[in-house]
Amino acid sequence: GYKLSEQYANVLPQLHNLYGLYQLLRKARTERGAIDFETTETKIVFDADRKIEEIVPVQRNDAHKIIEECMLCANVATARFLKKHKLPALYRVHDGPSEERLNAVRLFLGELGLQLGGGDNPTSADYQELLNSIKDRSDANVIQTVMLRSLSQAVYSPEESGHFGLGYTGYAHFTSPIRRYPDLINHRAIKSVIHGGQSSKDVVPPPKPDPELAVYPYDMARMEQLGEHTSMAERRADDATRDVMAWLK
């Protein structure tokens, strides 16, 4: 029968190359010790009348994972660009576990005969090593949930201090400017460099620079305010989503 590989023969070589790149990126992800929690997302299915028909789990395949790794690359590149050009912007910051949460999770794990490595300063690799060791246990989901809750909540901040869970020293959000305001802010920051006539080897000047896009009216004080507001708005949206999904289930 007719195969998709025949229909998309013109892009197949690029897809094969992209898949090879994805495998290298996944290997690098493992080597830097990024945490890979096995969580299941759900989606709402609507009927012909736009009424909710069912809620089903999203089945992740390699296509989803390829896109995810590409997005991570874009976000890391954004953080590096913002830092290089000394732009006040919003980084995605994820601190390690607090002393209180770390003590609580160690107490819980100890009752199960488990141990989280790293002493007083565990790394993301220590978390991932423990996750790998429990994946075949019947209570793996419970243990994973407790471990996840021991971590700090990621926030938006103009101070770049790394992302504990992903194992990055610098990280920012860039890929979703139509739905996340921090991404839009970072797009504006990048455009201000592109259209501002700055000499840089990583910027290709546009044929017709737009002076309006070169204007970037934000300072660190404003970024502090935006970081606090967008972090709060994200938590509020997440809480609302969980409440609605729990009610519908």
Regions found by a protein language model. Name each.
Residues 1-249:
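Electropositive polyanion-binding surfaces
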